[in-house]
């Protein structure tokens, strides 16, 4: 399979400052993109699953002309919307598909492990079975442990798990942690109507920073990876906390609250800057919230951040975020108490959609921004203009 982006498929831009479109790919007509990560000349894209597709692999040796090399369908009744790649391995989650009425039949629940001897043609070497509803998100930057959120048997909702990948052909659970009350035989202690559930953990030194839905930020001590324990927790109005990105050199973290409700006028979900320099975290400021989108249909609000993985563009000053119908937003945290928006990019709605739904993004080491649309827009490749490129160079960690 080979499919190359063409000028005829290039979308028009609704609004932009600091970023411009370099290329677009419709992912072979399966445009429901989710997590995206670049490693060398290979780009890995997970799919939300509404199209039935699971994973796409593209050759991006020429970023202006990505070529679709391989696609795998999602297993029945499941989706595989998250991808991580490092140390010659590709990890792909398997989870019960949540976006349509339940159907009979088995669910694929766990984590697939692929070798990347040929980065464009992965070969599966293992599957770790989680049971239950499966693995929602995995974070892995290489090394022994992969960090996952999953709902295994016997739990009400997603908890935090670690898998030991020291033998990639035989992954094994190394540890798990959950908020008291999540296990089915425990009594929940959080307010009625709230949800306490792990989304994912980002690791900095001996600390894991978890977005934990209505529990907000949860910080765990992982100095012994096999015995995690709670250090601190911070919540705020709104909930639905998704990502907590540590900026360890500055004692900060950036948190997104995921918009999970269609508009118009859904609850506000935004981006916050947190002080995590001590064991009592605090909210410092909110990032500017885009105007003019609240009355639109579908999702408007924060979702994913570029997560500063090794091998990517890394900054403790510039934050890249997806905002669904408000596109990509770039914030400057030079003064963390007064974050400023310094760039944005938004395409016209893809065919058949009332608005864009930009979903996830990855900023590569060269400064290109790879972005997906969750419904049908596929993949966008953005490049910074000279002003933003200079700022990115100055702000690089």
Predicted regions and their residues:
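Feature marking well-ordered beta-strand scaffolds used for ligand recognition
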Residues: 1-397
């Amino acid at each position: 399979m080979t499919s190359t982006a063409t000028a005829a498929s290039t979308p028009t831009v609704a609004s932009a400052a600091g970023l411009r479109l370099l290329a677009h790919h419709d992912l072979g007509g399966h445009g429901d993109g989710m997590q995206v990560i670049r490693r060398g000349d290979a780009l890995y894209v997970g799919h939300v699953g509404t199209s039935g597709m699971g994973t796409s692999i593209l050759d991006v040796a020429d970023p202006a002309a990505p070529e679709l090399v391989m696609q795998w369908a999602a297993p029945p009744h499941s989706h595989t919307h998250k991808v991580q790649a490092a140390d010659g391995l590709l990890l792909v989650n398997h989870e019960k598909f949540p976006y349509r009425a339940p159907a009979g039949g088995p669910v694929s629940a766990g984590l697939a492990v692929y070798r990347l001897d040929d980065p464009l043609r992965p070969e599966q070497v293992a599957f770790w079975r989680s049971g239950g509803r499966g693995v929602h998100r995995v974070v892995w930057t290489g090394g022994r442990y992969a960090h996952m959120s999953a709902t295994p048997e016997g739990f009400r909702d997603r908890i935090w798990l670690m898998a030991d990948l020291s033998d990639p052909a035989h992954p094994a659970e190394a540890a798990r942690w959950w908020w008291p009350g999540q296990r089915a035989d425990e009594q929940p202690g959080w307010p009625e109507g709230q949800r306490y559930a792990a989304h994912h953990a980002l690791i900095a030194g001996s600390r894991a920073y978890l977005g934990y839905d209505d529990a907000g930020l949860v910080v765990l001590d992982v100095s012994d990876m096999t015995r995690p324990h709670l250090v601190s927790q911070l919540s705020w109005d709104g909930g639905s906390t998704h990502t907590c990105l540590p900026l360890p050199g500055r004692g900060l973290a950036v948190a997104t609250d995921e918009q999970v409700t269609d508009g118009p006028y859904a609850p506000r979900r935004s981006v916050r800057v947190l002080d995590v320099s001590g064991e009592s975290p605090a909210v410092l400021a909110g990032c500017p919230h885009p105007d003019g989108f609240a009355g639109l249909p579908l999702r408007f609000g924060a979702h994913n951040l570029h997560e500063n993985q090794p091998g990517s563009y890394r900054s403790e000053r510039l934050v890249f975020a997806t905002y669904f119908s408000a596109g990509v937003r770039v914030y400057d945290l030079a003064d963390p108490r007064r974050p400023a928006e310094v760039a944005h990019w938004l395409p016209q709605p893809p065919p058949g959609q009332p608005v864009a739904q930009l979903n996830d993004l990855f900023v590569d080491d060269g400064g290109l921004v790879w972005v997906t649309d969750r419904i049908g827009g596929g993949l966008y490749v953005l490049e910074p203009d000279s002003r933003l490129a200079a700022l990115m160079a100055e702000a690089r960690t």
